[in-house]
Design a protein with these regions (language model features):
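Rossmann-fold NAD(P) dinucleotide-binding segment
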Residues: 50-115
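Rossmann-fold dinucleotide-binding core
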Residues: 95-176
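Short glycine-aspartate micro-motif
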Residues: 2-5, 90, 115-117, 135
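Active-site-proximal alpha-helical scaffold in enzymes
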Residues: 178-180
């Protein structure tokens, strides 16, 4: 599968390397260009912008740092939201708030883009060894499309619902447990 991969930090870099080792084609972008070099050394193509990484991709995977990074890439200076193609699969692995995930879900739905929220649990070593756990949420068909990619870098995938923000709410511990 052809993947646009955004965010090659401590978690993103080993995830990208696992995807490359699984035979996927990656076009990679990172705010700090130096962080793309290990993936490029393993066969990834460097992209100058997030939109260039997405061009011609079947899916994009984002492992950006926080809400501010996602805001900058999708709605700020890069305006990636305007470049995404209908039918694209977006697997969102970075740590963001449930509120921003909901905003992204609405914007994606309005453009015919499948969003699967997939925050990861584990360390960079776990990522490098394919031992991450993933909390996934999204439409059933989208999660099914995402599963082979998620399996490239995780050993456990817990699907928690059809609304992408559910995954980040659980990841953030912001869902109250019902009391008996």
């Amino acid at each position: 599968m052809r993947i646009g991969f955004l965010g090659l930090g401590n978690m993103g870099a080993p995830i990208a390397l696992r995807l490359l080792a699984s035979g996927h084609e990656l076009s990679v972008w990172n705010r700090t260009e130096e962080r793309t070099k290990p993936a490029i050394h393993e066969g990834a193509i460097a992209a100058a912008t997030p939109a260039e990484a997405e061009l011609g991709a079947d899916a994009i995977i984002t492992v950006l740092l926080d809400d501010a990074a996602y805001e900058e890439v999708f709605f700020g200076v890069h305006r990636l939201i305007d470049s995404l193609s209908p039918g694209l699969l977006h697997i969102l692995c970075g740590a963001i708030s449930p509120a921003l995930c909901q905003r992204l879900a609405v914007e994606h739905a309005n453009r015919g883009i499948d969003l699967v929220a997939a925050p990861v649990l584990g360390s960079p070593i776990d990522a490098a060894e394919g031992r991450l756990s993933v909390i996934a949420a999204g439409a059933g068909e989208a999660v099914a499309r995402a599963r082979p990619l998620l399996e490239s870098f995780s050993q456990h995938i817990a699907v928690v619902g059809t609304n992408p923000q559910q995954a980040f709410a659980i990841n953030a511990g912001s869902i109250d447990s019902p009391t008996p």
